[in-house]
Amino acid sequence: MIINHPSLDQKPTAVRWWICALLFFATTINYIDRQVFAILAPQLQTEIGWSEIEYGYIVTAFQLSYAIGLLMVGKLIDFLGTKKGFILSIIVWSLAAMAHALARTPIGFGLARLALGIGESGNFPAAIKTISEWFPRKERALATGIFNSGSNIGAIVAPLLVPIIALNFGWQAAFILTGLLGFIWLFFWLRLMSRPEENVSINAAELDLIKADTEEDLEKPTSIWKIIRTRKIWAIAIGKFMTDPIWWFFLYWLPKFLNTTYGLKLDKIGLPLIVAYLIADVGSVGGGWLSSHFLQMGWSINAARKTTLLICAILVVPIYWASGIDDLWPAVILIGLGMAAHTGWSANMYTLATDFFPKKDMGTVVGFIGMAGAVGGMLMASATGHLLQATGSYKILFVIAASMYGIALIIIHLLVPNIDAEKS
C-alpha cells in the first residue's frame, strides 16, 4: 500500500508572502517617518535659521543613535523574537516621529532625531530575521528585495503626503499624522504574525517548503564576539560602511539639492522626488529578483550574488554626471538610476547575511552590519554639512557616490572569495 505524504498533495499556501507584505509596509512607514524631516528641511531652515553645518549635525544625531541602536537592538530581537521586537521598535519610533512637532531649535530637532534613530534601528534586523524564519534560501533575495522596496515607496509617499499636510495644516501636523501610521500597522502585526510552525493559516506544504533548507533553531544565539572574528561579517560590514552613506546622502540632501540647484519649493519638489524613488524601487525588486533568477538557473550562490552586485556597481557610475547638468529631469533620471543600483545592491547585501549566518544569529548580524552602515552615514553627514558650507558644491559628493560600490565589491571579494564555502 502506498502512503502519500499530505504535503506532497497540497499546493503551498502563501502565508509567507503576507508576512513579507507586512515587512514591506513596516519599512514603508519607517521611511515615511524618516523622510518627513528631509522634505521639510528647506522650509524649516528658512523658518528656524540653521546653517548647513547645523543641519549636518541634526542628520548626524539620527545616524549616531541609529548606529548605537542597531548594535543593541539586534541582540535584543534575537532574545525577544521578531514579533515582540517589532512591536517595541515601531512604538518607540512612532512616538519619536510625532515628537518632532514639539521641536523649535536645532537642538530640539537633534533630540527628536536621536530618539527616532533608536526606534527605527529595529526595523531591518527584525525584518531580515523574519525573512530567514519564513523563507527558503532560494526565495530570500526576492523577499528581501520586496520588503526593502518599502524604503523607496516610503520615500515616494512622503513627498506626496507631507507637502499637502504641511501647506494646509502646518509642518507640525505633518510629523504627527505620519507618526500615527505605525500604530495602524501594529494592529495587523499583532493579528497576523507568528512563527511558521505556530501559524494557523499555513498548510503542511508551505511549512515543508520553508523548512526545506533551514536549520532547526534549537541552539542559543552565537556570541557577537565570535561572530565578529569571522571574515564574512567584515565583508558585509565594510560593504555597508562604504555604500550606505550614499543612500543616506540622497535621503537627506536630495530635497535640498533640488531646492538649491533648481529652485524647487515645497509645493514643487514632490514630483522629482517621486520619480527618483520610483526608479529606485525598480532596483530593489529587480536586484532581488535577478539574484534569485541566477540561482534558479543553476548558478552558484557566489556567482549569483556577486554578479548582481557587479551589475549594481556599474549602474551607479553614471550618477557622476548628475551634479553638472543644468536641466532638472536628466539629473533626476541619473540620480534615480544610481538610487536603483543602490537598492538592488542593498537587497543582496542583506541576503548575504542570510547566506552566511544561521537565523538564530540574524538579529545580531544585521544589527552589526547595519551599525557599520550607519557609522559611515554619520561620518558622511557631518562631512557633507561642512563641505557644502565651505564650497556650496555637490560635485565631490557625486564623485564619491559613483565610485564607492566598485571599491566595496573588490573588498568583499577579497575577504570572501567563495560565498558557497562560507554559507550557513
Q: Where are the language model's segments positioned?
A:
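Cytoplasmic helix-loop-helix junction between adjacent transmembrane helices
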Residues: 112-152
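Helix-loop-helix hairpin linking two adjacent transmembrane segments in secondary transporters
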Residues: 147-200
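Extracytoplasmic
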Residues: 18-52, 250-255
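C-terminal ends and interior cores of transmembrane alpha-helices
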Residues: 91-104, 310-326
